[in-house]
Amino acid sequence: MSIMSDAYMKMFPMEAEKKVSAGKRNPVLDVPEFNRAWNLYRDTSLDIMKRYEYMAQCVNFTDKDTEAIKESKDIIVANLKAILDHIYYEKLINDPWLSRWFRDENGKIAKEYVDIRRARQQRFLVKILECKWDEEFWNFVRWVGAVHVPIFGFEDLYIPIRLNLALWGYIHQYLFNLFASELKNDPEKLRRITTAWTKLFWIIIDVYHIDYFGPWM
């Protein structure tokens, strides 16, 4: 069991307790297909590598996609400063809702805090480009999401899930426009890279939001 799974069990000890039958038979679990589905749901809820493997199988994320992401590394690295500046200094601090979490008690943009968050986002992107889809990486992704909710973050911090999805969608299209500009003369490479990043984004989004749904994960 991973560190994050162990922490989850401590946060929700009822999930770790042995389930005792109430005496009522659930006929659904007599159906082999439903029983297998339940076991898969249970196993992929707490074992982060099984969760990744299942999601990768669902979206058909393969070694070819990993190679495509590696192909995009030079483009990302060459434009990393511009990408981060755009996300933080053009999008986040100017959005009427998203910017709320980057303001001080007087409502002014807290530039030092923005710079800290920008540096953390850079670390996140660099870790993605390492293409190491191991337990350490996925626990890191989960932690990045978890600190945005009271479970593992600050008690008064809760970033609504739709804002996360909006920002991930924004980053997604920004990167794709960048790839389209850089690879306009190589449509096949563009297809490989954008397809791979799309699949990876959906897997990351799933793991990122695990602790948003802790009580019934």
Question: How does the language model describe each region?
Answer:
Residues 12, 21, 48-66, 70, ...:
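Heme-based O2/NO sensor domains and their adjacent alpha-helical segments
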Residues 2-33, 37, 43, 47-54, ...:
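Short terminal or interdomain "cap/linker" segment that borders an active site or interface and mediates
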